Swiss-Prot record:
May have antimicrobial activity. Keywords: Antimicrobial. This is Putative antimicrobial protein 3. It comes from the Eukaryota.
Amino acid sequence: SESILIVHQQQSRSSGS
């Protein structure tokens, strides 16, 4: 569960940049 949240945040950050 936590792993999924972390991955989602990392992906969102990459897209934002």
